[in-house]
């Protein structure tokens, strides 16, 4: 039985966002908001799996364009939601495998951190129900229509509730059963737990854990992600063409009478890309990371090495903003394979293929590439720092 599973709810109609795509599918620094939210859960050690709840009819699109495209392996199911939030969470509960704890999270809160997820889960393990929350900074007044008398609420007793909210599985099931029997509606799941007689523990959240609901929220989120300079790196690599070797470029086996000589699979394109990424991060080069005299890397797929570089970038709070690469080869003709190379690179780096460009050219018979002695590759990578509130200062 899994220990902790999450229900990520993204079935809203997005009426307050205005015209255009729904809020969960709007691009935030080049990636869908929902994709950024799922990214946090994908790399949160406290979470074993995720059930994604979307609007009816959007399941296949989300599986293909978000879950599969960005490689979210923890998503165990994508299910249709209901008319109101309570029904959507209930749909997610029905799709959950057996587990001890359940987290419920808004799909449009991409700035929650792995540390906060772990804290709220541990609190629910101890007391049954917990939520992230922050005290209000502003004075809060209670009143009716404009012009009606108002009263000021004591701020020290108030909390602004966020997600994720965490529950022991039996607690959340009972709360939803009672809510359905009584016809209770609520804007969050802790309200249902309270109505069922359970106490809910407040766990300190962060003011940056915003729910993106309006265009103003989206602009604020862009500012959170976009702070700091763009980091640029350049990569170059070359390998000799020899007999009795496969030709691997961008993780694609390209039919040819010769292949590239190297300690690994000699994927010259991926090597140039890794050098560009490491250069942008100020982290040396592939010779330092993967020495050619280390037997560990003999014959290894360069795509596997790129996976390690991508993981390092995430640990450093960096993500790829844009990648442009060119392969220089007189032969073979590479255009039929370019799109697969691009998709392979984008998948490992966790970005949209639109952020990756791969092209091929020749040197018109000049030099070692023109004579067919070898193949070269150049790459330029741009990285951005991701702000991770509460986990680290970047």
Curated annotation (Swiss-Prot):
GO biological process, one term: terpenoid biosynthetic process
Residues that hold a divalent metal cation according to the record: 237, 239, 271
Cofactor: a divalent metal cation
Keyword terms of this UniProt record: Isoprene biosynthesis, Lyase, Metal-binding, Multifunctional enzyme, Nucleotidyltransferase, Transferase
Annotated site (Transition state stabilizer): 16, 23, 263, 362
Pfam families linked: IspD, YgbB
Family matches, as InterPro entries: IspD (IPR001228), IspD/F (IPR026596), IspD/TarI (IPR034683), ISPD_synthase_CS (IPR018294), MECDP_synthase (IPR003526), MECDP_synthase_CS (IPR020555), MECDP_synthase_sf (IPR036571), Nucleotide-diphossugar_trans (IPR029044)
Function: Bifunctional enzyme that catalyzes the formation of 4-diphosphocytidyl-2-C-methyl-D-erythritol from CTP and 2-C-methyl-D-erythritol 4-phosphate (MEP) (IspD), and catalyzes the conversion of 4-diphosphocytidyl-2-C-methyl-D-erythritol 2-phosphate (CDP-ME2P) to 2-C-methyl-D-erythritol 2,4-cyclodiphosphate (ME-CPP) with a corresponding release of cytidine 5-monophosphate (CMP) (IspF).
Protein name: Bifunctional enzyme IspD/IspF
Species annotation: Desulforudis audaxviator (strain MP104C)
